[in-house]
């Protein structure tokens, strides 16, 4: 009887440990995706000169490494902002 209770206790501990590790993996993945997202936004602004602004986020963008540039709203860690985004 004691050995059965001990075995059940060990199984319960293993199950609890496995589920908590999986939860930690999910949180780590969310953090990594978030940092990749902000890194990509920061990369959009490199090499660009801009006069973007106003309530409709209008203006001009000139980028040294791309001919396809435009003003658009971006999400930054501090909130929303109008900026220059280049592709290509």
UniProtKB/Swiss-Prot annotation:
It comes from the Eukaryota. Expressed by the venom duct. Residues 1-20 form the signal peptide. The modification 4-hydroxyproline is found at residue 55. Contains 5 disulfide bonds. It is found in: Secreted. The modification Serine amide is found at residue 87. The modification 6'-bromotryptophan is found at residue 80. One of its GO terms (molecular function) is ion channel regulator activity. Keywords: Amidation, Bromination, Disulfide bond, Hydroxylation, Ion channel impairing toxin, Neurotoxin, Secreted, Signal, Toxin. GO terms for cellular component: extracellular region. Residues 21-46 form a propeptide. Sigma-conotoxins bind and inhibit serotonin-gated ion channels. This peptide selectively and reversibly inhibits 5-hydroxytryptamine 3 receptor (HTR3A) through competitive antagonism (IC(50)=53-86.8 nM). Belongs to the conotoxin S superfamily. The cysteine framework is VIII (C-C-C-C-C-C-C-C-C-C). This is Sigma-conotoxin GVIIIA.
